[in-house]
Amino acid sequence: MTKPRKPVQGIGINDMPIGYSTGPEKPVYDQWVNVLYRAGGGEDGAFYKKKPTYVGTTVCEDWITLSNFVAWVKSHESWQGKRIDKDILCPGNKHYSPETCVLVSTRLNNLLTDSAAKRGEYPKGVDRPNKTFRARILMHGKKKTLGRKFNTQKEAHRAYCKAKEEYIREWAENLTDADTCDIERTREALLRHAVIEGNAWRETEDSADSVPTLFG
């Protein structure tokens, strides 16, 4: 008699053949486990303590069963080498499901990452290496410093948001199958994110100082 498998992350049902988790499609299995981990918070909620922005994260009932998750991933022609993203299509989304998630490249997945814990007390894209503030953006895998030094964090943040809007629009205009498994939905979503960044810097445009652009 086959011994029942222990639920993965306390809720997941691994109904795939023995050895699937260590075979050629191990990356798919690992992503499934990661989704369950984020939805459950790990042992004693350790993950949520480390990354509180994930508190309240959920996963759809279908994806609790591994074979369903695998079927969704492999229903996309260019799924290999991509990872699941829950934030691009729906800003602020905390639910993993076919309707709210998309498979994207690691570079695109990192485009909208907000490392609040790393930046500390300052807004996105802003740090203070000395008495003045600095605006920086991760572009094409490298950190780019934007323009001059800034006297206030508001000015630096405005410069970052303007540059981010331009960069997101550049991404949206040049998407390929290598970036996402759903070009149209991803493009529409990126343009929505660009609007959000644009609104952020326009709201503080009352300053007399000019804001450096990313491409000109």
Protein language model regions, located:
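An aromatic-rich alpha-helical recognition segment common to small helix-rich domains
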Residues: 69, 126, 135, 150, ...
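Charged, amphipathic alpha-helical interaction segments
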Residues: 106, 140, 161, 165-168
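Short, cationic Gly/His-enriched loop motifs
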Residues: 19, 23-24, 31-42, 46-138
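A short, exposed loop/beta-hairpin motif centered on an aromatic-Gly-Thr core
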Residues: 57-61, 142-154
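Structured segments of extracytoplasmic/periplasmic soluble domains
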Residues: 38, 72, 163-166, 170
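Plant transcription-factor regulatory intrinsically disordered regions
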Residues: 6, 11-28, 52, 60-71, ...
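Extended, polar beta-sheet/loop recognition surfaces of beta-rich domains
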Residues: 4, 9-11, 108, 116-118, ...
